[in-house]
């Protein structure tokens, strides 16, 4: 099987830069205020997704209290001992050794360092794995240390440069991907590993070569993954418009001039020959191939393959078309494209923008690869949930190293996926059926996740043993995101396809009402309901969410109950109903009792501590002409025997009646027959 890191790229000059839909930081506001915010109607947890094209290095934020790029700190379990084998060709030197903008792709970029061929091995070793000015201190070692909470690091030893015996395109042109592109009279489809690894082993000896766990082959020039679109349909209106500069080499008596300037490529019918003739990054048998345009996200993605985890992405232009699987949220999906400037800058050398900082691995992949401890996962069973009652748990952002007792994910195992069958050939939103689990995880825009489009909660379905298409993000906003991808040469806008990974930029769930996202998700067929109850961001800046999972239709073992105190208070002190509004604060009591028998339900682990709460749905009404109400959060949770404060925002027009009565109803989600009501009286002239 070919494992590849793929791209949807475009020339920056041809792009329509899209505005972010909200504030650029993507960070939810502090939740849980019980004293009324300055604006009682303020949205608790707004969805502030950001278009990757608009991101800059200013979006990067270090996880609090960390210095994962410290080269003196090694992985507590292992440091990957990796050889970096640098190779160039008779027809293609390393781009970084050339004058700025001098190759056909206008690389290297202005301001690039002046590097000689003999300096190439050290340059790319340092660029990839030594904190410095050019890479802004970001390294492969940093990525894996952060992603694994200090368990795995990277040691990189560099070799070469080795001159390959054949021309670059004889290795780069693939037999199936680029059929018909080999210059007439020449032979292509050669495996770069044979000559690259052969030269390396001959140089250092078999015994020393065997001392390395893995090998990165770094090929001079571009990779096809990062150039096929931008130097294809983005630059040229039609394939016949591709200029000779991007075509095959001039004829030398072998008839090469009969080849067109375009060629077949992986995802669409054509690209320029110059793009098609480059290698496509891939991994297998202990080695991976990359090129100079391959960012650190590509190296991290290919290293993941070498650890025996597969791709989880689609063809964004496939026929039939399918939605992206996990999009920008997963290193094994299009998260490998993440970085400032978005995917359309991945063609640049050196790779300092798109693809330079891929996302973290998902919670599913972290468990699979041993990047986190099992203690940081809450493992529950859907079937046991029917007998134990709902579970409430606080989940911390996956970028944060969990402390003892902290969770970075919830894993809900199912004995069978009961979802109705769907057909991937006719429905682009079909998940393919046959999943074994649901996962809940929190993503925050810091560390390697800084260039994810949003902060919030990701729900996904996963398969245990599948090697590809094994995880499917539940999209909180499944509608077409309707963003322009680029402009064609004639000025026609090309929209992001339904299969484009950026369709999932607004997929995360958020707490509270009016967020632009959703705060709950129900899978009726699988009898599961998920709740996003409240966001929390502590003084250090760590993001977490209180979440809950309930079996729909089970026999709840607990006695449920709820009470609202009658003396609701107006807790806003600096505003009036006719200004920003006021807050009515209600005291909610969980009057239910816990049944110890629930702890005997056969979950994969002891979940007793998470069974001792209920979730309540809040609804508010108001009596009075010209008045309005809103519950900033339609959900609340409280442990058995405990109380919490819940809020209702109340506002009035200047012409409203002088007084109004607000009624709040709180209903148990576990047992809707248990509910309580209380009133709050307000006067538009007083706060």
Swiss-Prot record:
Keywords: Glycoprotein, Hydrolase, Metalloprotease, Protease, Secreted, Signal
This protein's record includes keyword Cell membrane: no
Residues bearing glycans: 54, 114, 252, 256, 379
Major location category of this protein: secreted
Keyword Hydrolase: yes
Signal peptide range: 1-22
GO molecular function: metallopeptidase activity
One GO term describing the cellular component: extracellular region
Listed EC numbers: 3.4.24.-
GO biological process: proteolysis
Places the protein is found: Secreted
Family assignment from sequence similarity: Belongs to the peptidase M10B family.
Record-given protein name: Putative secreted metallopeptidase
Source organism of the structure: Arthroderma benhamiae (strain ATCC MYA-4681 / CBS 112371)
Lineage: Eukaryota, Fungi, Dikarya, Ascomycota, Pezizomycotina
